Amino acid sequence: MANLDHLALLKSGAVRWTKWREDSPEISPDLSYADLTGINLRGRNLSNVNLANSNLSNAILIAANCETANFTLANLSHSLLMKANLSNANLSIANLQDANLKGAFLGAANLIGADLQGANLSNADLENVNLIGANLQNANLKSANLSEAKLIRANLNEANLTEAHLNYADLSHANLGSASLVGAILYKAELRQANLNDAYLHKAYLFDANLSQARLINADLRWANLRGANLRGANLTGANFRGAIQNIISEEI
């Protein structure tokens, strides 16, 4: 449970909270299970704070420093986290439905099993983030950096990954049905047994990507760069490869 003194300091205002954090760097504030619905924490220093199981729905955390904070099982639905620093934060099984994380920094964060359905992650930095089993259905990841991200078994159905960077990302067994990957960069990405049915991969860069046993039924791969891609055992029924065929050298269509 939350430390009542820590909670009182948080609610006393930005000036007192900031001074206390500066004067007591050895203390890791405990705000677990706290009801912080709609609270304004814009720009606050929440680094290393325990917010597990807290309710931060509709909270304002714009440009907040949440580095290494613990948000396990926290409710952050509809929260505003634009340009927030969530690097190395633990957001496992957190509820981030419809949260706005535009331009946020989540490098190496733990989002295993997190619910990001409908979340805005456009231009966010998600390099080396762990999103295994996460729900990203209808999420906006336009121009996001997902290089080396772990997206195994993630649900990205109808997600917007237009011009996203997915170099070396692991999307094996992921659901990318009807997702937009137009102009996305998937250099050496792992897409083994992924569902890409009806996905939009127009002008996508799939150089050396592993698409073995992937489902690409009715996928749009026009002008995609598939040089060196592994399509062994993939289901390509109805897929459109116009302008991309000449780039496929590892497998015959």
Report each predicted region and the residues it spans.
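Tandem repeat scaffolds
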Residues: L7-A8, R16, W20-I253
